[in-house]
Regions:
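Conserved S-adenosyl-L-methionine
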Residues: 28-34, 139-142
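Rossmann-like NAD(P)-binding element
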Residues: 55-119
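Conserved N-terminal Rossmann-fold NAD(P) cofactor-binding segment
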Residues: 6, 31-76, 84, 311-318
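C-terminal substrate-binding/catalytic lobe of Rossmann-fold NAD(P)-dependent dehydrogenases
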Residues: 138-143, 153-333
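Conserved glycine-rich cofactor-binding loop
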Residues: 15
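Rossmann-like NAD(P)(H) cofactor-binding subdomain of soluble oxidoreductases
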Residues: 91-159
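N-terminal Rossmann-fold NAD(P) dinucleotide-binding loop
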Residues: 19-20
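Hydrophobic Val/Ile/Leu positions in short beta-strands of Rossmann-like dinucleotide-binding domains
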Residues: 11-12, 37
């Protein structure tokens, strides 16, 4: 079996549904033969490892450990789903306090045990904040830490596909930017349906303005809808898409969706948010984001919401004031 790389990939939170699915997805994609599974819950972790062994994959060196030092040492790529799970009735923001502390500890462990790691994808919520905290405490470059922010865009494509009764492949370039939550900015100007600009369809009998508003609302509540339907939070979609992200960072296929990345461009500053990017072996690089005046206003509103969350974390003492971030991580200007 051919692999994208032979370097070590560590899955943090591997005993959970997301983590275990990430591990299997990475193996089936042929990313690397060297995969380390980490989770503090040792019995569940061993169970996941046993299941993967029983799959009979060829050419794999799958290891597992509940020792974070062992898990991170020599790791070149990390995907972290090791936060507290979102439960029914909770927003991503409800998880802020608990998962902020987890992200801080993780960032410090990265700095201590694998400072030469090449790329990290953080997916535990609220990912915009946990990714930011990880970046600051790890001491890595902003291009080396990304967060899962694509599911809102994939959900937009799904909702448009269902509305028009067409294959999802016929709905192109769906994009949401800003926060990964109820305050995201859902864009219409980027998308095409059967080759036709979505903006030209909205307001017609095919898609009234009221129907478009309903679709936007469904997208912003897509994660909560999965919880209501399945009785648990999403795990298949975040597992797959996050592994697509790390695959791109390894030098695999280009990542097709927006990623959560550190933005500080004069208009939006000192924040982790969903943005148009390219992810390659050289890291995550920002592209231009353009929209209608209404969309740009929505993005500014989303940014303000993220800043409020960031400032709450600062008030909690998890992060220092923005003016002191450079002391914590010299790559943050």
């Amino acid at each position: 079996m051919e692999f994208v790389t032979n370097e070590k990939l560590t899955i943090v939170g591997a005993a959970g549904m997301i983590g275990s699915n990430m591990a299997q997805t990475a193996i089936m994609m042929g990313l690397t033969p060297n995969i380390c599974l980490y989770d503090p819950y040792a019995p569940g972790l061993e169970g996941v490892a046993e299941e993967l062994y029983h799959c009979g994959f060829e050419g794999m060196n799958i290891t597992f450990t509940s020792d974070i030092k062992e898990a991170l040492t020599d790791a070149k790529y990390i995907v972290n789903s090791g936060g507290a799970a979102r439960k029914a009735g909770m927003t991503r923001e409800d998880l802020l306090k608990r998962n902020a502390a987890i992200a801080e500890e993780f960032g410090k462990n990265v700095k201590a045990y694998c400072p030469d790691v090449k790329h990290i994808v953080v997916i535990f919520n609220p990912a915009d904040i946990t990714g930011l905290i990880t970046l600051l405490y790890s001491g890595l470059k902003p291009s080396q830490v990304t967060t899962l922010a694509a599911l809102d865009s994939t959900r937009l494509r799904s909702e448009l596909s269902k509305h028009f009764g067409i294959a999802m492949d016929n709905v192109e370039n769906c994009r949401t930017y800003g926060g990964h939550g109820e305050q995201m900015a859902v864009y219409a100007s980027t998308a095409k349906v059967n080759g036709k600009a979505l903006l030209d369809i909205i307001g017609t009998d095919a898609l009234t303005k009221e129907q478009w508003t309903e679709i936007q609302q469904k997208v912003t509540k897509g994660g909560a809808n999965i919880i209501n339907l399945r009785g648990r939070s999403s795990f298949q979609s975040p597992s797959y898409v996050s592994i697509e992200m790390i695959a791109a960072a390894m030098g695999g296929k280009p990542f097709r969706w927006p990623a959560g990345t550190y933005v500080s461009n004069g208009k939006f500053d000192h924040i982790m948010m969903a943005w148009e990017t390219s992810i390659t072996k050289d890291g995550c690089h920002l592209k231009e984001v353009k929209g209608t005046p209404e969309e740009e206003a929505a993005l500014e509103k989303s940014y303000a919401h993220l800043c409020a969350l960031r400032d709450e974390v600062i008030a909690m003492g998890v992060l220092p004031p923005v003016s002191e971030w450079n002391k914590l991580n010299p790559y943050i200007k």
